[in-house]
A protein has these predicted regions:
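Short, positively charged and aromatic/hydrophobic N-terminal segments
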Residues: 13, 20-25, 29-33
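N-terminal amphipathic/hydrophobic targeting modules at extreme N-termini
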Residues: 3-4, 9-10
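Feature targets compositionally biased, intrinsically disordered low-complexity regions
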Residues: 3, 15-18, 31, 190, ...
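Short linear sequence elements within intrinsically disordered, low-complexity coil regions
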Residues: 16, 26, 211-215
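Active-site- and interface-proximal helix/loop "cap" or "latch" segments in soluble metabolic
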Residues: 37-38, 71, 75-228
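N-terminal intrinsically disordered, cationic/polar leader segments
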Residues: 38-66, 72-81
Length: 228
């Protein structure tokens, strides 16, 4: 408890100057973002750290799709990065963007990355390696491809995090990938979570033809289709 009180006291001291920003953050949280979680223990009224991530999907005139990702990290108090550069409250520590251009098969045809804000001067060099993801498929082996092509010091931790989760908005953008295309196979999102469990009520209600579907049956059907 002492540690928590000390932390709150320190927060009040170092957050003295950007009070207006903190007030805006609290107001936004209270008025625009009601919290459905149960009440927490006593804590600072404004968050210490905020990370906002947004994904957007667009249909292109050439038949492709663009999926864009944006990441912003902010503090509600002034900080010094590595004891040198001062970053005021509300100014992003990280502000990064990615655009993927994909086809109907979820294959990456183009990728662009940019860093508006970053902690070190040479961080943007990590965007060059992003081109290695061209030709990779979001639908299969996506996380492995990211680890193989952008892992460790080759890439950027935050760009990798954005890429990891671009698969879901990509599927939501290319809507026909969720439908039944007459192949006899279930849509790709079935069997991937509790809500769409083949043995659950969701599939029984909305996809009764795939109720109690077995993955091995799916594999056998794929092999038969390929051979034909």
């Amino acid at each position: 408890m002492k540690s928590g009180l000390a932390h709150q006291t320190r927060f009040k001291i170092i957050a003295g100057d950007p009070a207006r920003f903190r007030h805006a953050v609290v107001a936004r949280h209270n008025n625009g973002y009601p919290m459905p979680l149960p009440p927490s223990a006593s804590r600072t009224p404004a968050p210490i750290h905020m990370r906002d991530v947004k994904y957007r999907g667009y249909a292109r005139d050439d038949g492709m799709w663009d999926v864009e990702a944006e990441l912003i990290d902010q503090k509600t108090y002034d900080i010094e990065l590595h004891g040198r550069r001062k970053v005021p409250a509300g100014k992003p520590i990280h502000h990064m963007w990615i655009r993927l251009t994909i086809d109907a098969d979820m294959v990456v045809h183009g990728i662009e990355a940019a860093m508006d804000d970053h902690p070190l001067g040479h961080c943007p060099q990590a965007t060059k390696s992003m081109q290695k993801m061209v030709g990779c498929c979001i639908a299969r082996g996506w996380r492995r491809a990211i680890a193989d092509n952008l892992g460790g010091v080759v890439g950027c931790t935050h760009l990798r995090e954005l890429l990891f989760n671009m698969a879901t908005p990509a599927f939501h953008t290319v809507l026909n990938q969720f439908g039944n295309n007459g192949s006899g196979l279930p849509p790709r999102h079935l069997g991937q979570c509790l809500g769409w469990d083949f043995n659950g009520p969701g599939v029984a209600e909305f996809y009764p033809e795939f109720k109690d579907w077995k993955p091995q049956a799916q594999q056998q059907l794929r092999e038969t289709t390929t051979q034909a």
